[in-house]
């Protein structure tokens, strides 16, 4: 038996994305967003949505670029702070002791201490209401060597990405792998005639 | 030291979304997508992206509606199968023994056995390349009573949502809560002068 929860923005899990930008003074800034995801494979594109009232909004509109950092468990409190405080009120990254370098591909900063970052050029902007959705075309992804194996594949146990639960408002690490895509479902596939 | 992984569609984690539609014969169908997320709070909107080659694509274009089911741990193999097989080849839901009812709000089916479903009206369609992104305005969310407490709040331990790791291609349950949003970051906030 199902009960109605009403019309709400609820999906589980969401990523915990730190959006990096340069403001109109050229200062690096960052904010945390959970409204986002992958939206295309070729070209590789992602979405991130944020409110017009944010300090980051103007930077995105002006520079047409952002970096998107995947939050790992060690940066839980830092990412939460980046979602609470505003770049208008001071140097958030400095407060956290985080350092940035300029991306060579897009007009946005890379936060060096975060393990995985997407460098994105904004290709579409959609005003959806309270949030504006920025579709970014991924120009490159950079990852710390420590979260890659010798073949350059990602090591999730090293990356330790965080997931977020909207409305419940909690952050979670990933449990163990419970199955593999395009494999776990094979047991339901029709058996081929012998 | 960071290494370049190239331009790829990578974010961690993604949700595991089962997209419900009616085909041109009025038959219920479902496919699994990981390219999606929340994109606006007011009005509440979500995105889901899929390829033109999918059977579901034509249904979305025709009916301008979909349901989005959050996959829970018990439905891991079912959702993986729904992402492997095509509705062109047979009754996927029937194969899985899953049953549907018609949504009263949008022209799409609700899979009764999945614990949480969003009923969505398509408000924007964006051809991004290999994938087309369908922005859906959430008309209502319905949840099994067993995943709600007496106040109607979601119980994550009962819901057990799955997260997906692109490229690594594994499904994961959520670990324990490691912190609470708008709270864990307080330790970085400037202390107010006494």
From Swiss-Prot, chains A, B:
Annotated function: Participates in the reduction of hydrogensulfite from hydrogen.
Gene: flr
Family the UniProt entry places it in: Belongs to the flavoredoxin family.
Species: Megalodesulfovibrio gigas (strain ATCC 19364 / DSM 1382 / NCIMB 9332 / VKM B-1759)
Cofactor(s) required for function per UniProt: FMN
Name of protein: Flavoredoxin
UniProt keywords, alphabetically: Flavoprotein, FMN
Subunit structure: Homodimer.
InterPro entries assigned to the protein according to its UniProt record, in alphabetical order: Flavin_Rdtase-like_dom, Flavoredoxin, Split_barrel_FMN-bd
Cofactor binding: number and manner: Binds 1 FMN per subunit.
Single GO term (MF): oxidoreductase activity, acting on the CH-NH group of donors, NAD or NADP as acceptor
Domain of life: Bacteria
